[in-house]
């Protein structure tokens, strides 16, 4: 992918932008997701221009670019989320559809703050965990296990348009599990 900055002369031609968010201050047990954007970029050097099974050449169908990394502050969660949100607002204002690679799950909240600022969005979420906890470790509201609870509370996610696939694992005492008898409920 070509690498472009937001001030590039050709930025308005970009339809899909790859954005790294090298941040993992919201994780409680396994640091390292901040290395995800670099690792994904390193591994993607082997991606071929055409899908062998479908013969589709996605990079000829749309204009993709690597827009670099969102600015982060590893020392301050609130400031970091503000910086990420402001960066994504610029992406949104240019009409670019972001594809985010990055840090821990809390990264989703500032991205949603930018993308859903005008109206709530739906989400298809593939994960082993819901990330809907009220808090972690006696009251911490901004962790890798809480971003979608915060997003719903802030009116960013419409819970009637959220689908979570692959949920498994144990739960903490006192957690509520909400289920629906029908996918339409």
Regions found by a protein language model. Give the residues of each.
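Metal-dependent C-N hydrolase catalytic cores
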Residues: 1-121, 164
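Acidic active-site catalytic centers that drive phospho-/nucleotidyl reactions
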Residues: 69, 104, 127, 131, ...
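Glycine/proline-rich, flexible active-site/cofactor-binding loop segments
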Residues: 85, 169-177
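Active-site glycine-rich loop that binds ribose-phosphate moieties when present
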Residues: 107-110, 130-134, 138-154, 165-166, ...
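Active-site catalytic microenvironments for nucleophilic, acid-base chemistry
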Residues: 114-118, 154, 182
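Conserved catalytic palm subdomain of right-hand nucleotidyl-transferase polymerases, strongest
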Residues: 119-135
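Short, structured loop/turn "capping" segments at alpha-beta junctions
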Residues: 158-161
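Conserved small/polar residues in nucleotide/adenosyl-binding loops
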Residues: 178-185
